[in-house]
Amino acid sequence: MKTVSASAPGKFVVLGEHAVVFGKPAVALAIDRRFRCNVSESDVFIVNGEEDDIDKHPHVKHILDIHGIDAINLSSESNLPSGAGLGSSAALCASLSCAVRHMLGKSLDSEEIMREAYAAEYYAQGIGSPMDVSASVHGGGIGLNLPDADELLWTVENRGQKWDVCDIHAPEMTFVIGYTGKRALTGPLVEKVRRYRDRNRFAKDIVDEIGTVTLEGIGALNTGNKTELGKLMTENHKLLSILGVSCPELNRLVDAANEYSYGAKLTGAGEAAV
């Protein structure tokens, strides 16, 4: 029986997480850690050699539902920590969509894989933008809702929000990612910010300000101005902290990093990586 393998990278967010859910701009870069999966046809659902209940794996279930499949034999490995803000679930969805499509002899078109992966992410989390899956499928750097973007990859619309996703060419820079060891669930944190923004004008202003900071940061990133970009990343972290998605451990990491860097911020939904 033929086994098909695929892998996809994780990501980190340079600027704009949470605000991007509401259509504000954001920038993310793929990283050199990946989720890898192997799939083959099966009459029962098997994960890493053990028969399992597919309802416990909503991301996987939704991708299989898209293709009208009840079960597969799935094995996986990853050096992306789960719940660390590095897009592990997006990498899972992207790699699984690619592998299943290849197994079925379907097109490996990047946009089709991205749309399947985003549908699975949204199904599992109930909220969110296509930022993570776009970075995972496309690789390199991606921007969302950037003005005057030249290299449009795809446009995604969902529940009144629209995201134009483009390729960006980031100059050579070094980013260091730290991890608190805490696991944070994306869905509840994004929903927490949504409720806060819907009920509080101040929170809406903070989300708008994150969008402004991100636009300023795009200019700094494009010109390779590390000093300005670092300052704006730190400002972005302060705004995210006001929204309530940071934690003492993250704040200590940011404070420590700021002494020896151009700037620092949390990445992803919060409460995990910086």
Segments from the language model and where they lie:
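Short, solvent-exposed polar/charged micro-motifs at secondary-structure junctions
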Residues: L15-E17, S82-L86, T155
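Short strand-loop junctions, especially beta-strand C-caps/beta-turns
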Residues: E17, E50, E77-P81
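Glycine/serine-rich anion-binding loops at beta->alpha junctions
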Residues: S7, S78-V100, S129, Y262-V274
